[in-house]
């Protein structure tokens, strides 16, 4: 689930030496599976460990992960890096914003995953997002835009030249896209 480099393990062990006995490290994700997901590391006293938590054994301490965060911390890596600028603890969690999907995932799951991992990070630069409403029997992916995309004058270009092309290329079952958003231009609109 989570790999912690030997240098990071030594760093944690050193920090934990100044804490109460049986204090461990908790690794977590706030807002998992969303574009606002943020990972964190904190001290975890023994009395804060829940029955549903997952314990990972490391050199001199346990890593504690709550059940909700666990799938989003799959393949996460924690390292303690020293360079000419100093030292830094890094936590890379490639699945924090969208969990991995299995090879036999439904078309809806695969399309939603593509929107969450490929499209929404780009739209987030403009304060926008898109979600899948449904996929029709004719293979049309019906989408709804929000945030800065609502009312944006460039939405047709984003929809047809960006999202639709990517979806048709990636999913042979998709024949097109449709936007059901009731666009209202305002201060929130990007363009």
From Swiss-Prot:
The cross-references to HAMAP family, in alphabetical order and at most eight, read:
Fe_S_biogen_NfuA
Q: Which gene encodes it?
A: nfuA
Q: Which SUPFAM superfamilies match?
A: Fe-S cluster assembly (FSCA) domain-like, HesB-like domain
Subunit structure, interactors included: Homodimer.
Q: Which GO terms describe its molecular function?
A: 4 iron, 4 sulfur cluster binding; iron ion binding
Q: What does this protein do?
A: Involved in iron-sulfur cluster biogenesis. Binds a 4Fe-4S cluster, can transfer this cluster to apoproteins, and thereby intervenes in the maturation of Fe/S proteins. Could also act as a scaffold/chaperone for damaged Fe/S proteins.
Q: Is this entry keyworded Repeat?
A: no
Question: Which protein family is it in?
Answer: Belongs to the NfuA family.
Bound cofactor: record note:
Binds 1 [4Fe-4S] cluster per subunit. The cluster is presumably bound at the interface of two monomers.
A Pfam family this protein belongs to? NifU
Which species is the source of this protein? Pseudoalteromonas translucida (strain TAC 125)
Transmembrane residue ranges: none
Q: Name one GO biological process term.
A: iron-sulfur cluster assembly
Report the domain of life of the source organism: Bacteria
Q: Where does [4Fe-4S] cluster bind?
A: 149, 152
The name of this protein is Fe/S biogenesis protein NfuA
């Amino acid at each position: 689930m989570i790999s912690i480099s030997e240098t990071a393990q030594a760093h944690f062990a050193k920090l934990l030496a100044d804490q109460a006995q049986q204090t461990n490290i908790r690794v977590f994700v706030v807002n998992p599976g969303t574009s606002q997901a943020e990972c964190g590391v904190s001290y975890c006293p023994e009395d804060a460990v829940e029955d549903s938590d997952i314990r990972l054994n490391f050199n001199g301490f346990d890593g504690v992960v709550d059940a909700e965060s666990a799938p989003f911390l799959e393949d996460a890596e924690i390292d303690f890096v020293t360079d000419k600028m100093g030292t830094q603890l890094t936590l890379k969690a490639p699945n924090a914003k969208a969990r991995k999907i299995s090879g036999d995932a439904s078309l809806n799951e695969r399309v939603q995953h593509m929107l969450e991992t490929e499209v929404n990070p780009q739209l987030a630069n403009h304060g926008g997002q898109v979600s899948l409403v449904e996929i029709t029997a004719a293979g049309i992916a019906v989408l709804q835009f929000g945030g800065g995309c609502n009312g944006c004058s460039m939405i047709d270009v984003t929809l047809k030249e960006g999202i639709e092309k990517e979806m048709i290329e990636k999913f042979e079952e998709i024949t097109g896209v449709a936007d059901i958003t009731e666009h209202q231009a305002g201060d929130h609109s990007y363009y």
